[in-house]
């Protein structure tokens, strides 16, 4: 329940722009969220390895 309430709190429009923050759409994590994908680095890594994010693959050079 705590994560659901935090997601609702984050979705509200804040009076000051500094108070806005991103939260992972999948797990609700507030830190290390990739804005382009809307998910945190942990979920991004998991989905990338599973091949669920089109165009993303592990780098090798």
Curated annotation (Swiss-Prot):
One of its GO terms (biological process) is translation. Pfam families: Ribosomal_S14. Disulfide bonds: none annotated. Its cofactor is Zn(2+). Binds 1 zinc ion per subunit. The keyword Metal-binding applies. Zn(2+) binds at residues 24, 27, 40, 43. GO terms for cellular component: cytoplasm; small ribosomal subunit. Keywords: Metal-binding, Ribonucleoprotein, Ribosomal protein, RNA-binding, rRNA-binding, Zinc. GO terms for molecular function: rRNA binding; structural constituent of ribosome; zinc ion binding. It comes from the Bacteria. The keyword Ribonucleoprotein applies. InterPro entries: Ribosomal_uS14, Ribosomal_uS14_bact, Ribosomal_uS14_CS, Ribosomal_uS14_sf. Binds 16S rRNA, required for the assembly of 30S particles and may also be responsible for determining the conformation of the 16S rRNA at the A site. Part of the 30S ribosomal subunit. Contacts proteins S3 and S10. Belongs to the universal ribosomal protein uS14 family. Zinc-binding uS14 subfamily. This is Small ribosomal subunit protein uS14. The lineage of its organism: Bacteria, Bacillati, Mycoplasmatota, Mollicutes, Entomoplasmatales.
């Amino acid at each position: 329940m705590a994560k659901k309430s935090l997601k609702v709190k984050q979705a509200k429009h804040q009076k000051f722009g500094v108070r806005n923050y991103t939260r992972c759409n999948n797990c609700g994590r507030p830190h290390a969220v990739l804005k382009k994908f809307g998910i945190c680095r942990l979920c991004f890594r998991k989905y990338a390895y599973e091949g669920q994010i089109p165009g993303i693959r592990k780098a090798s050079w």
